[in-house]
């Protein structure tokens, strides 16, 4: 549940609890309470694992993302902007944030199909160490300043960091490719972000980086397993709840909300 910041002014509460058959639910009380407790515990374990994996990634990034690397990224971004991003006629572009990927019960996923549907030209930023954010931020800022709308796609593990950038008006995208989730097609251009790192530092840190990668992958796998368990328990919850929900009333409420939103567009 998301609490509205300005109830009645910008947002409003939607009470779907009125759609329950409360008397009928009493007959499955014990089963509901058991499933509810179990699946919440699985989610908590998954979140702890993902938090730990993110902290390991932060440690790797702090090691490799030196000022010299950021300078190389900035120079490369300036070259791309001068070549690909032409100044528009109007005001600054509009930015929206959308997650393109997630860690789910099926594993780590990314909807690259969305990129293909919106953009013909795709730059793949090959980035096994999670360093591409400064470059993507500079590209996004340049595109917006030139008057182009942008879709900023944050990382699921690091929501304050960009992982992908889509510029549909230019049919141009910049996607981060990793060993776990590489861009599945032949890219328009490929940029090896890892090649910008200090070679001597990479060599000295090889064992540390290998260990970090192994532990991080294990933590994500454990999180995925916990999410799969949570989904199984949630599916059982739905089996218990569904016979006691007035779905006609649910759909009627949904249509009312859709009509209200459509009228405001």
Sequence positions of predicted segments:
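Accessory recognition modules or surfaces
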Residues: 106-113, 119, 167-172
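Conserved nucleotide-sensing/catalytic segment adjacent to the nucleotide-binding pocket
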Residues: 1-43, 142-221
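A broad, low-specificity signal for short, low-complexity segments enriched in glycine/proline
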Residues: 84-87, 132-138, 155
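N-terminal pre-Walker A segment at the start of P-loop NTPase domains
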Residues: 79-114
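N-terminal low-complexity, Ser/Thr/acidic repeat segments characteristic of secreted
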Residues: 90, 121, 255, 259-265
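Glycine-rich phosphate-binding P-loop
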Residues: 109-110, 119-143
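An accessory alpha-helical subdomain
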Residues: 31-89, 208-257
């Amino acid at each position: 549940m998301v609490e509205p910041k300005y109830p009645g002014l910008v947002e409003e509460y939607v009470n779907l609890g009125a759609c329950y058959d409360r008397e009928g639910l009493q007959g499955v009380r014990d089963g509901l309470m058991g499933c509810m407790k179990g699946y919440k515990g699985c989610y908590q374990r998954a979140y702890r694992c993902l938090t730990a994996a993110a902290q390991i990634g932060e440690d790797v990034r702090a090691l490799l993302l030196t000022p010299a690397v950021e300078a190389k990224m900035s120079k490369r971004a300036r070259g791309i902007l001068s070549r690909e991003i032409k100044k528009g006629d109007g005001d600054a572009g509009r930015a929206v944030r959308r997650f393109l990927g997630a860690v789910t019960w099926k594993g780590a996923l990314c909807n690259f199909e969305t990129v293909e549907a919106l953009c013909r030209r795709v730059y793949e930023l090959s980035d096994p160490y999670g360093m591409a954010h400064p470059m993507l931020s500079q590209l996004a800022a340049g595109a917006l300043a030139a008057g182009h709308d942008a879709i900023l796609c944050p990382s699921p593990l690091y929501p304050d960091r960009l992982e992908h950038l889509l510029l549909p008006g230019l049919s141009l995208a910049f996607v981060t490719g990793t060993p776990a989730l590489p861009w599945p097609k032949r890219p328009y251009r490929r940029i090896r972000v890892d090649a910008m790192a200090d070679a001597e530092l990479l060599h000295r840190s090889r064992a540390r980086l290998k260990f970090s990668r192994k532990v991080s992958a294990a933590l994500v796998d454990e999180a995925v397993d916990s999410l799969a368990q949570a989904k199984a328990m949630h599916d059982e919850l739905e089996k218990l709840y569904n016979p006691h929900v007035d779905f006609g009333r649910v759909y009627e409420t949904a249509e009312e909300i859709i009509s209200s939103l459509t009228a405001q567009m």
